[in-house]
Amino acid sequence: MVLPLSQPHFSGALLLLVVSNLLLWEKASAIPACMAQKSGCWNPLVETFNSAMQTAGTLRTLADQFYVELYHNQFSSGQFLIFNSNLIRRDETVARAGTYCHSTLSNPPDRGTEHADAETEKYLKTLINYVGAWIGPLYHVVIELNVMQDVPETILSKVRQIEENKRKLLEDLRWILTKVYPTAEMKEEFPAWEHLSFLKSQGKHYKLLAMFNLSNCIYNETYHILFYLRELKCQITGEDC
């Protein structure tokens, strides 16, 4: 039987269609999932860094407000002015409270160094301990403020908000560590706050001295946290360098 002249043409067209579909499928499968979204690439790691930086910015604002409130509210302003006066006179106890913080940060790792990845992992762990170091003290300050007399709601609410945002930031940092370094072993070591005994004492003077220490340290550390988060985001994600 003689085949119609159109059959080879039909078979060739069908073959071309199959091959074309296969090529399209291979091309589609090669596109990263994030590029296939209409809104563009969504990177959970970058978004978590953004969340952490937003929380750190909120902490910066709250720390400013808390610091100002303690110096202007009748509940604490008089004693804080005395602390500053004693600080100038180099009163040893007040100087310790006004200048020493129980948690510190080293310099971030240099970009592009030979062991940059290992240094970045180590520094991320250090930042976790740095942020977590004040959660315990803040928790105790909230407890003490709740039982002290004539505590303004503005002061109490600020401490609560700072504690909540500290916990939120800590969770973001923990997630980043497990995402970037899934096999990393993390030992969280939050140093003891030496002014806890002052906070737990009976005298208002010593309780406020503990808050003097906390407010100064929280006020200063929020600047550092924002800076180091930007550095880590750049080194880990390559974004916003």
UniProtKB/Swiss-Prot annotation:
Glycosylated position list: N213, N220
Cellular component terms (Gene Ontology): extracellular region
Zinc-finger is among the record's keywords: no
Tissue expression per record: Detected only in placenta. Localized to spongiotrophoblasts and trophoblast giant cells of the placenta.
Annotated disulfide bonds: C34-C41, C101-C217, C234-C241
Localization: Secreted
Any one GO MF annotation of this record: hormone activity
Superkingdom of source: Eukaryota
Keywords: Disulfide bond, Glycoprotein, Hormone, Secreted, Signal
Signal peptide location: 1-30
Chief location of this protein within or outside the cell: secreted
Pfam families cross-referenced by the UniProt entry: Hormone_1
Family from the record: Belongs to the somatotropin/prolactin family.
Protein name: Prolactin-8A9
Native source species: Mus musculus
Gene: Prl8a9
